From Swiss-Prot:
Designated name of the protein: Probable GTP-binding protein EngB
Similarity field: Belongs to the TRAFAC class TrmE-Era-EngA-EngB-Septin-like GTPase superfamily. EngB GTPase family.
UniProt record, GO biological process: division septum assembly
Gene3D superfamilies, per the entry: P-loop containing nucleotide triphosphate hydrolases
Organism for this UniProt entry: Sinorhizobium medicae (strain WSM419) (Ensifer medicae)
Positions of the EngB-type G domain: 33-217
GO molecular-function term, one example from the UniProt record: GTP binding
Binding-site positions, GTP: 41-48, 68-72, 95-98, 162-165, 196-198
Pfam families per record: MMR_HSR1
Functional summary from the UniProt entry: Necessary for normal cell division and for the maintenance of normal septation.
PANTHER family to which the protein is assigned, alphabetical: ENGB-TYPE G DOMAIN-CONTAINING PROTEIN (PTHR11649:SF13), MSS1/TRME-RELATED GTP-BINDING PROTEIN (PTHR11649)
Key words, A-Z: Cell cycle, Cell division, GTP-binding, Magnesium, Metal-binding, Nucleotide-binding, Septation
Superkingdom: Bacteria
Residue numbers binding Mg(2+): 48, 70
Amino acid sequence: MSATNNQNAASVFGRPWIFIRGVPSMKFLPPEGPTEIAFAGRSNVGKSSLINALVGHKGLARTSNTPGRTQELNYFVPDGYSGEADDLPPMALVDMPGYGYAQAPKEQVDAWTKLVFDYLRGRSTLKRVYVLIDARHGIKKNDEEVLALLDKAAVSYQIVLTKTDKIKAAGVPRLLAETLEKIRKRPAAFPEVLSTSSEKGEGIEELRAAIELAVAR
């Protein structure tokens, strides 16, 4: 990643960020404007914690030890922009409901699933999805289903391993290589896997730079 990309990422993520909207269904989506970067993953994979680490604000995205807490598409943008057509923020981060939470009522799971899939298929300003994978568990069946959906919808995505501090450091390179091999033939997958630990702050700068590069493409 170039020094310029790192500087640009620092300029965006160095600003204060704010929560602007929770979206329980597609009709409540904000008007299409800034580029959107979304975060998908299984329940309790650490999406909210990773967003907080990215923007340097521990309390921005609500975190919980209870799987399935995030039930809406939650929108976050850098502060200081009016939102008018000539003063849009450079990007919006979207925290998506987690999938794969078996204890939630089926109707609730179905509603979350429909919201996520409709959003992924139909949002023209969505530039990239970061699919978070718990480093302790690897890619599961329902992760594969989401990757297949993204491939079918031709939505660019990149795999991000989370909670790498929970496994032995020596195992991280092997896990990165194994994960990359699993997605190698997927048409919409970006051919690089990132590793992060929100708790330790590891890989956060690299993820910021990757997001900035994706937005600039």
